[in-house]
């Protein structure tokens, strides 16, 4: 696995060879989702972007809207469009933030239902792709420890605590030994 992100600088390090993937996605949108306003609007935007790219093919073709279209089609059109837009429009920034925090995901490849190379993966010292979770989690844990974040492993949240107005103010959880743990917080 890896982390999907659309329109990153790392994609531009690749030669674009996924025209068939873009065409297939646009065809799937037209053939299978003509009655879905979100998919139809995204497909129209992507078709315009694709035509502009074909007229002047520089860099690697991808866009936030193409990632949204892939995600909406992958979810059979029932995804929450606002959540999909949030995910896709922030994905490149997430890759950049990880980079700023010492987590390098420069290897870009195809994966899942993406029409273009969009999955960003880590590599080891020999250039071999490694599991993103096994790579990232220890680095993020180290950053959390440096920042003084208390981590609770093998602890299962069982209840969200709320105040009289219904705002979340903490959680109750069960610890590894079966003990009840209460965590109060300003934000949950």
Task: Specify the residue positions occupied by each region the protein language model found.
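Conserved N-terminal glycine-rich FAD pyrophosphate-binding loop of Rossmann-like flavoproteins
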Residues: 1-17
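Generic low-polarity alpha-helical segments
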Residues: 3, 10, 140, 144, ...
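A composition-driven signal for long, intrinsically disordered, charge-rich low-complexity tracts
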Residues: 8, 20-21, 114
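Acidic, His- and aromatic-enriched active-site or binding-groove loops in soluble protein domains
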Residues: 8, 174, 184
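Charged, glycine/proline-rich intrinsically disordered loops and linkers
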Residues: 15-69
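Conserved redox-cofactor binding core of oxidoreductases
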Residues: 46, 59-179
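Short hydrophobic core segments
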Residues: 157-158, 182-188
């Amino acid at each position: 696995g890896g982390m999907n992100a659309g329109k990153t600088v790392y994609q531009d390090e690749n030669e674009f060879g996924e025209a068939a993937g873009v065409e297939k996605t646009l065809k799937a949108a037209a053939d299978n989702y003509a009655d879905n306003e979100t998919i139809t609007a995204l497909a129209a935007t992507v078709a315009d972007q694709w035509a502009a790219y074909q007229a002047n093919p520089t860099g690697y073709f991808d866009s936030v809207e193409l990632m949204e279209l892939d995600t909406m089609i992958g979810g059979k059109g029932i995804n929450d469009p606002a959540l999909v837009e949030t995910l896709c429009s922030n994905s490149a920034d997430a890759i950049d933030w990880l980079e700023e925090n010492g987590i390098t995901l420069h290897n870009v490849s195809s994966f899942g239902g993406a029409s273009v190379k969009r999955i960003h993966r880590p590599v080891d010292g020999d250039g071999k792709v490694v599991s993103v979770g096994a790579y990232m989690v220890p680095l993020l844990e180290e950053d959390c420890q440096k920042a003084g974040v208390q981590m609770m492993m093998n602890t299962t949240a069982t209840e969200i605590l709320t105040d009289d107005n219904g705002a979340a103010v903490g959680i109750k959880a069960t610890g590894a030994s079966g003990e009840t743990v209460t965590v109060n917080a300003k934000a949950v």
